[in-house]
Amino acid sequence: GLYNDLFDKYNPDMVIASTPGWRMDRYLLRESARRGIPNMTVIVGWDNSSSYNVSGADVQWATCWSELQKEELVKGSDWNPEQVIIGGIPSYDGYFRKQWLMPRDEYFKLHNLDPNRKLISYASSFVHFAPNFPNIEALAKLVSSDELAEPSQLLIRLHPSHFQDKPKIFADERTQVFELEKKYPHVHVVQPVALGGSLGYYGGEDMDEKSSMMAYSDVVVTVYSTMLVET
């Protein structure tokens, strides 16, 4: 198998994966099942128990966020309810502990924000689900016109898909957003930071950025995004 060398070297007592056997995880979990090593999956996303719940390997245990997710696993994918444990959302513990939070002045300085203006943040979603640009442009015009009850500014967080050059709609909208930043005052874009290699740019793992944006925004606007759950 693909992971024979690792199993031979470490001889694990248990194998835990963040999916029930998608992509490369399926080979890891299949190898553990073949060797008779106990295994389990940890549900990490709000929609994983409903949209991606079919196992790609023989998985013994699952831990999920809530009673609703457990119901989705049991009724939607025939999991044995005795093998599904409700364990909360460990990946969000850092939000409650505030371990990722930057100081406000440091965050505002990072994005050239005005500390005296209210902050409206827009978290983009998949372009092919709903174009972001019409919403962003409307907000950009609004904060730049000073027609709101209080002086405000707009911070735009692009979606990881914006950094793909194919299909072209991703790159086109990315270009539109950066042009908008040049055109209007009080409009700022979270600058993309390369994650290294083929990993692309900021996505789900830039916790300092995400948690600070949500903590210091007066309003967060998004359409069909996991950011709704995190907010």
Across the structure, where does each feature detected by a protein language model lie?
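Redox-cofactor binding/interface segments in oxidoreductases and associated redox assembly factors
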Residues: A17, C64, Y122, I156, ...
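Conserved catalytic-core segment of nucleotide-activated headgroup transferases in glycan assembly
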Residues: D93-A194
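Catalytic cores of nucleotide-enabled group-transfer and carboxylate-activating enzymes in metabolic
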Residues: K70, R104-D105, V221
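Structural motif
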Residues: D13-M14, W61, L119, Q153, ...
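Active-site and donor-binding regions of nucleotide-sugar-utilizing enzymes
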Residues: G1-Q99, L199, E209-S212, M227-L228
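Glycine-rich phosphate-binding loop signature in dinucleotide/nucleotide-binding domains
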Residues: D8-P12, L113-P115, Y216
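Residue-level marker of alpha-helix boundaries and capping positions
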Residues: S18-T19, W61, A130-F133, K168, ...
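Donor nucleotide-activated moiety binding/catalytic core segment of transferases
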Residues: F7-D8, K168-V229
